[in-house]
Amino acid sequence: WKIQTIANTSQLQFDQEFGNTFFGTGDTLINAESLMKLKAKNPIEALESGNLLIYEKTQKNHAYIMTVDVSKGRGQDYSTFTIIDISASPFRQVAVYRNNVISPILYPNIIYKYAKVYNDAYVVIEANDQGGIVCNGLYHDFEYENMYLESAVKADKIGVEITRKSKRIGCSSFKDLLENDKLEIVDQETIMEISTFEARGQS
């Protein structure tokens, strides 16, 4: 029965439904009640060798935002992006990309491709460490201008520099959106990650 149920849903949904794992205990950033409401969906399509999961196709006249995290591409941390439909409340997660071997030099190609697919999505890239390479590649090489800039004049001011302050603001905004049902997250891996976010001190 358990195997059949998991096959028809997912391990995450089974654990949520039947109490094997209780998310949101301890000092998680998002409260338990909100975490329990999150329901993973199956993607309607997998592209880019399975690294890109599509949950909703692009809709005409809809506005999208793409948030981008960059890793070194050496098989450890993942370079990821999430595409959110921000046309109406609640906002909806519509696509997720994850790849732990893509080089920061090649990553702008993928970002550009799907930012264009999703109606020239507004792109926000974490500029720390390898992120600067990706920011400059997208903005200067691809001449993609619909992205967050701290300054268009200074080369190192493209994207968002993650500091303790900006992380605190970002986490607070994310918490507000989720706990007030203003954002729907449907990707299983994303839900698992959200469930382990911990609130630690001032950061």
Residues covered by each model-derived region:
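RNase H-like, metal-dependent nuclease domains and their acidic two-metal-ion catalytic environment used
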Residues: 2-152, 156-164, 168, 172, ...
